[in-house]
Design a protein with these regions (language model features):
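Positions that flank functional sites
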Residues: 34-35, 80
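C-terminal, non-catalytic tails of nucleotide-sugar-dependent glycosyltransferases
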Residues: 26-27, 42-117
Length: 117
Protein backbone atom coordinates (compact mmCIF):
# COMPACT_ATOMS: atom_id res chain seq x y z
CA UNK A 1 0.00 0.00 0.00
CA UNK A 2 1.15 3.53 -0.68
CA UNK A 3 1.81 5.79 2.28
CA UNK A 4 0.33 8.73 0.36
CA UNK A 5 -3.15 7.35 1.05
CA UNK A 6 -2.60 6.81 4.78
CA UNK A 7 -4.80 7.00 6.68
CA UNK A 8 -7.97 6.55 4.72
CA UNK A 9 -9.44 5.78 1.37
CA UNK A 10 -7.66 5.00 -1.84
CA UNK A 11 -5.02 2.49 -0.82
CA UNK A 12 -7.01 -0.61 -1.88
CA UNK A 13 -7.88 0.72 -5.36
CA UNK A 14 -4.31 2.00 -5.71
CA UNK A 15 -2.96 -1.51 -5.08
CA UNK A 16 -5.51 -2.91 -7.55
CA UNK A 17 -4.43 -0.37 -10.19
CA UNK A 18 -0.77 -1.32 -9.69
CA UNK A 19 -1.72 -4.97 -10.18
CA UNK A 20 -3.81 -4.08 -13.25
CA UNK A 21 -0.84 -2.24 -14.78
CA UNK A 22 1.29 -5.35 -14.18
CA UNK A 23 -1.20 -7.46 -16.13
CA UNK A 24 -3.20 -9.05 -13.32
CA UNK A 25 -6.75 -9.65 -14.54
CA UNK A 26 -8.28 -11.74 -11.76
CA UNK A 27 -9.76 -9.74 -8.89
CA UNK A 28 -12.03 -11.90 -6.75
CA UNK A 29 -12.98 -12.35 -3.14
CA UNK A 30 -12.18 -15.91 -2.07
CA UNK A 31 -15.07 -17.91 -0.59
CA UNK A 32 -16.10 -16.35 2.71
CA UNK A 33 -12.90 -14.33 3.09
CA UNK A 34 -13.81 -10.68 2.98
CA UNK A 35 -12.36 -7.39 4.07
CA UNK A 36 -14.93 -5.34 5.89
CA UNK A 37 -14.50 -1.58 6.05
CA UNK A 38 -16.34 0.26 8.79
CA UNK A 39 -17.33 3.22 6.64
CA UNK A 40 -14.32 5.41 7.42
CA UNK A 41 -14.94 5.28 11.18
CA UNK A 42 -11.35 6.20 12.02
CA UNK A 43 -10.84 8.79 9.31
CA UNK A 44 -14.22 10.42 9.89
CA UNK A 45 -13.22 11.14 13.48
CA UNK A 46 -9.90 12.58 12.35
CA UNK A 47 -11.25 14.15 9.17
CA UNK A 48 -10.22 17.72 9.86
CA UNK A 49 -6.72 16.67 10.82
CA UNK A 50 -5.99 14.22 7.99
CA UNK A 51 -8.43 14.98 5.21
CA UNK A 52 -9.93 17.87 3.44
CA UNK A 53 -13.29 17.03 1.94
CA UNK A 54 -13.68 19.04 -1.22
CA UNK A 55 -16.24 19.42 -3.97
CA UNK A 56 -14.18 16.85 -5.91
CA UNK A 57 -14.47 14.20 -3.20
CA UNK A 58 -12.24 13.01 -0.40
CA UNK A 59 -8.49 13.39 -0.35
CA UNK A 60 -7.86 9.72 -1.26
CA UNK A 61 -9.97 9.97 -4.40
CA UNK A 62 -8.21 13.21 -5.35
CA UNK A 63 -4.78 11.60 -4.90
CA UNK A 64 -5.88 8.58 -6.97
CA UNK A 65 -7.22 10.85 -9.71
CA UNK A 66 -4.02 12.88 -9.91
CA UNK A 67 -1.84 9.75 -9.80
CA UNK A 68 -3.70 7.59 -12.33
CA UNK A 69 -5.73 10.09 -14.39
CA UNK A 70 -9.04 8.43 -13.47
CA UNK A 71 -11.00 8.35 -10.23
CA UNK A 72 -11.71 5.36 -8.01
CA UNK A 73 -15.35 5.04 -9.09
CA UNK A 74 -14.39 4.98 -12.78
CA UNK A 75 -11.69 2.36 -12.13
CA UNK A 76 -14.06 0.12 -10.18
CA UNK A 77 -16.88 0.49 -12.70
CA UNK A 78 -15.02 0.15 -16.00
CA UNK A 79 -11.92 -1.86 -15.11
CA UNK A 80 -12.71 -4.03 -12.09
CA UNK A 81 -16.44 -4.21 -12.84
CA UNK A 82 -17.11 -4.39 -9.11
CA UNK A 83 -20.88 -4.63 -9.43
CA UNK A 84 -20.87 -7.66 -11.71
CA UNK A 85 -20.67 -11.40 -11.15
CA UNK A 86 -17.18 -12.90 -11.36
CA UNK A 87 -16.69 -14.57 -14.73
CA UNK A 88 -12.94 -15.13 -14.86
CA UNK A 89 -10.25 -12.95 -16.37
CA UNK A 90 -11.18 -9.32 -16.82
CA UNK A 91 -10.69 -7.73 -20.21
CA UNK A 92 -9.86 -4.16 -21.07
CA UNK A 93 -12.80 -1.81 -20.47
CA UNK A 94 -15.68 -1.87 -22.93
CA UNK A 95 -15.29 1.53 -24.59
CA UNK A 96 -18.90 2.42 -25.29
CA UNK A 97 -20.77 5.71 -24.96
CA UNK A 98 -21.09 5.32 -21.16
CA UNK A 99 -17.35 4.77 -20.85
CA UNK A 100 -16.57 7.95 -22.79
CA UNK A 101 -19.18 10.04 -20.94
CA UNK A 102 -17.81 8.88 -17.60
CA UNK A 103 -14.25 9.49 -18.82
CA UNK A 104 -15.17 13.02 -19.89
CA UNK A 105 -16.54 13.75 -16.40
CA UNK A 106 -13.37 12.38 -14.83
CA UNK A 107 -11.10 14.43 -17.11
CA UNK A 108 -13.10 17.61 -16.43
CA UNK A 109 -12.74 16.99 -12.70
CA UNK A 110 -9.00 16.43 -13.13
CA UNK A 111 -8.73 19.66 -15.12
CA UNK A 112 -10.61 21.52 -12.37
CA UNK A 113 -8.30 20.11 -9.68
CA UNK A 114 -5.17 21.03 -11.61
CA UNK A 115 -6.51 24.50 -12.34
CA UNK A 116 -7.68 25.44 -8.85
CA UNK A 117 -5.64 23.29 -6.45
Amino acid sequence: FSVEFSPGTGSDPDLNMKLWKLGVRIFKGVSKSRVYHFGSVVTRQKEKKFFSITDTGNKGNKIFLKKWGINIRFFKKHYLRSDTKFEGLLKEPNKNINYYLDLLKVKLTLFYIKLFN
